[in-house]
A protein has these predicted regions:
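Acidic, glycine-rich two-metal-ion catalytic cores of nucleic acid-processing enzymes
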Residues: 207, 220-251
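N-terminal leader/targeting and assembly helices and adjacent pre-domain segments
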Residues: 1-216
């Protein structure tokens, strides 16, 4: 059992590394979006809300509509959150979009991609850990007592059902915590972006400030992801063992 726990721990560390890479990629993409759009809404006196609220026109609108189509295609391929997909589709159908809306939608898209990847990777990890621990427990019981010899391996769909049932006292599952982390980052970026525009900061200063906030948000998200992966991996392993004992009627 100790070897299995060590294997689960290594898998959790590997999953965290993949999540960390996805968040880093989102940070670079967000930095690019920030630089592009803050330069566009700049005047001689700095960035302004008046410029930010101007409608996209002609080539600028065509460019963003094409970008939205790419976001939608990626969402369809990666099973994005349905509410976000609806927002993208609604925006794609609109005749008028402001520069600020375009900027925020792009930032939110990259957040959705990164946290969506975190959700998938975490779910895959927990599914594998549950199946491995459940199967190993059944094997050990059968080897020692003969009980459970006919117990088959648990399938992926059955594990998904288990993962949708909260084990923590606050009633949240791993996905709830991931989307909460994403919402916190998006809310903070919105607040800081609005502040930079309202103060009329110089473009370079605003870009520097916003990329700092993105980096802070990613650092926080990484910390939460690391803690989540390790905590959930340990809990799901224990739950698999408990459920196997229960299924076999073993005390």
């Amino acid at each position: 059992m100790m070897m299995l726990e060590e294997s689960s721990h290594r898998s959790a560390q590997e999953t965290y590394k993949e999540i960390s890479d996805a968040l880093d990629d989102a940070m670079y993409q967000m930095d690019s979006v920030i630089e592009k759009w803050l330069q566009r809404i700049a005047t001689n006196n700095g960035i302004s809300m008046a410029e930010a609220r101007k409608w996209l026109k002609n080539a600028e609108l065509d460019e963003f509509k094409w970008t939205l189509e790419q976001y939608i295609k990626k969402g369809q391929q990666n099973a994005f959150d349905q509410q976000w997909m609806k927002e993208l589709e609604n925006a794609s159908a609109r005749a008028h979009i402001t520069r600020l809306e375009a900027m925020e939608m792009s930032l939110n898209q990259y957040a959705q991609e990164a946290f969506g990847q975190e959700n998938k990777l975490t779910g895959d990890l927990l599914t594998q850990i549950y199946q491995d621990r459940y199967g190993h427990t059944a094997f050990e019981i059968a080897k020692g007592t003969g009980v459970g010899v006919t117990l088959g391996s648990i399938n992926t769909e059955a594990v998904k059902t288990v993962l949708q049932n909260p084990w923590a006292s606050d009633g949240k599952i791993f996905s709830d915590r991931i989307w909460s982390s994403m919402d916190d980052m998006k809310a903070e970026l919105h607040k800081q972006l609005t502040r930079q525009i309202l103060t009329g900061a110089a473009p370079d200063a605003a870009i520097k400030a916003m990329t700092k906030y993105v980096a802070q948000g990613v650092t926080s998200a990484k910390y939460r992801a690391g803690r989540l992966v390790m905590t959930e991996a340990a809990a799901i392993g224990n739950l698999a063992q408990h459920n196997c004992y229960k299924e076999l009627g073993v005390e």
